[in-house]
Amino acid sequence: MTNHTRNNKQSKHNKTQKIRILPNLTSGQRQEICKTYSNVFNTFEDKMKPVDITLNKEINNLFKIPFTPSKITPNNDFYSYINYRWIKDAKLNENQEYITQLDSFRLVQYKVYRELLEIVKEYTRNNDTKKSREIGNFYKSQLKGSSLSQVKQYANETLNMIDDLRKDNKNLWKLLGVMNRNEIISWGLPFNFNVFPDNKNPKIYRCYIDPGKLTLIDINLYYDDGTDLAYKSNYKRQFFKYLNNLFEFVFGKNHGFNVKDIYDVEVELNQLFECVGRINDPNYYNIVTTKIAMEEYGFDWAQLSEYIGFEKTPDFFISGDLNYLDCCTQLLKKNWDTEKWRTYWIYNYIRQLVRQNQDGYRIYFEFNGKFVTGQTAAVYDDLGPVFGLGYAFNSFLTNEYISRYENKQYVDYLKTMAEDLKTVFTRIVSRNKWLQPKTKEYALLKFKHFKLIIGSPKTLRE
């Protein structure tokens, strides 16, 4: 009984204390206490200064102050209009004059090029292994370049190989295979071989056969349709001048080649993109087996893969355009060994070869750099080796660069942002009411398995 009485008294005492601490307050008083109470986040309300709404007129006037010359408007040059002040302050040094489009990406790219070359110099200086010697020899070779006599020797050896193969029409696949071994020239061949991750299963590498790239970046130049006559005439005149200088540099003034054959061949190749009759996969993913390639297209995948260097023919390759595959095969089988195509084959080789010689590179630059892209200066001489090193030692350079310069904070930030975006889009699709159930199901499945690689993949192909 005594304990019960004591508890009741204590309870009454507590209630009395509460009443003393928190008397009846008005709504405004409670808010004031809550604002200043030590365990509550500070609000920004009390820090806001009253703003005279008449200042709106002054603010509007500030926005009207021009920050670009009057001739630059969002309508005629949006890029310069937005970035005028940055462009005005950003200056290229002498070694960066090859850059034609001034932006932060290209300036950072230049910085990365320099850092890669420093990695090469440091690695070869501090290591004495087979790889370090290979990298060192390659770097010195690229820096020194090839002499004119070496250029002529390599060009004539390749031309002799082409002529030997032309003696038998069946050697088409051998020629394509041998030339596709070299990535520096293979991109311009009628059939360009590559090994890429499978578009439908990135963990597996597949063989891809795709059209090569034509020389002229404006495909309208391959059409004689009566339009832009002055522009096309001038462009082709510059192109033929470049081709003639190229062949004279390598084979002498009396080289005997008709350089206009190169343009004519590329006109034929461009027309192949208009071929029809085959049904293509909408995602440019057409699996072509060795048997189908030979029986339906006349494309000898077995021979081509053998001369590329495969000991065993891959069961299939992937083509982005079956119509091109069909029509180009027929064109090559009919014409590849003609004089016109002889000029084209050797052109694919020597246009890259001359870039290894200082004087030859100037010929290449005058057309491809100065005329086509508007470069005011060639790539600085000591920067040149970085491009060849990128082909020969790509995995090594990537791994070394990441080990030295990776910023984990940036990587983590981008990963988090990407995951947040993935979550947002997943929710949007989940709430969608108009998609077909099956389509919605597959879309969500893709989001679930979607992976974004930032920096570099865990493993790189050597």
Q: Can you say where each PLM-predicted feature lies in the sequence?
A:
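Compositionally biased low-complexity segments enriched in polar/charged residues
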Residues: 1-35
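Hydrophobic/aromatic-rich, well-ordered segments within soluble, folded domains that form packed cores
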Residues: 67-88, 227-247
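Long, K/E/R/D-enriched contiguous segments that form extended
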Residues: 399-462
